[in-house]
Amino acid sequence: MHPPGAPFAMAEGAFSLSAPAARSPGGNPSRLHSIEAILGFTKDDGLLGPFQPDGGAGSAKEAADKRGPRHCLPKGPAEPPPAEHQGRFQEPYCPGSASPELPAGDGGDGKPSDEEQPKKKHRRNRTTFTTYQLHELERAFEKSHYPDVYSREELAMKVNLPEVRVQVWFQNRRAKWRRQEKLEVSSMKLQDSPILSFSRSPQAAPVGALGGSLPLETWLGPPVPGGAALQSLPGFAAPPQGLPASYTPPPFLNSPAVTHALQPLGAMGPPPPYQCGAAFVDKFPLDEGDPRNTSIASLRMKAKEHIQSIGKPWQTI
């Protein structure tokens, strides 16, 4: 039996750090259930020992040197970190270099990788055609501007070219042909435009047609049948050809005053001949029997007779 205050003292001693170790009921000193054993402290630690008032600061410093670093956890073999973590933390960190987690192509320099960069367009070299190949291709183009695939393959085997090259050649040749057609059509339109036709010089008419269309002088023409003396005079023009044959001159021409004025014209002789040089006369001799001279004289005589016949009715009246 314990005294009345014993249970409280035992409980207080059990929870105090300076209390002796509580032993098991069997008295085995190896099995300790004290707080020091649970927390892992040893008897060498100065903090667990009794208070030493005479030790001073020197004893406290010696005790601190003896105990070393304080461990709050039970001592045991420390587990090494995984190998991947050890390798990650052992490598030095450099801001300019790429992160170890990123691949080599995804650095911080901002340059895209080879896959992200657009591929350069492969430039094909121009195909150089020989004279024989061009001749055969032109012959095939004359036959058909749009050959089918079988004709192109046959032609490609004949000229020793890929079928793709033959197809491209036909496309380019058709484009050239269309351009030539447009140029020809535009040139024809320009030739047919009224501006150019107006600016062209008129073609010379044939000499025979021109001579036939121009009227001759009245005194050079043949004698006028029918005695139209007034019309044969140099001062009067012949009536147009479109007028009827029964056309008569106006009545005022038959008046006595006009008749009297026209009489001196009939009495006038032929104009004096032109005086030509001796060389010109010798080279081009004048023909005395020229019919034009006789026709002029006969016309004047007929005009005089006509005027006299016109004046006779007035005399009888």
Curated annotation (Swiss-Prot):
This protein's record includes keyword Nucleus: yes
Residue interval(s) of motif Nuclear localization signal: 300-304
Ranges of Basic and acidic residues composition bias in the record: 108-118
Gene Ontology cellular component list: nucleus
Main subcellular location: nucleus
Motif (Octapeptide motif): 33-40
DNA-binding region(s) in UniProt: 122-181
A single MF term (Gene Ontology): RNA polymerase II cis-regulatory region sequence-specific DNA binding
OAR, short sequence motif: residues: 294-307
Superkingdom: Eukaryota
Location(s) in or outside the cell: Nucleus
Pfam families reported in the protein's UniProt record: Homeodomain (PF00046), OAR (PF03826)
PANTHER family in alphabetical order: HOMEOBOX PROTEIN, PUTATIVE-RELATED, RETINAL HOMEOBOX PROTEIN RX
Protein name: Retinal homeobox protein Rx2
UniProt gene name: RX2
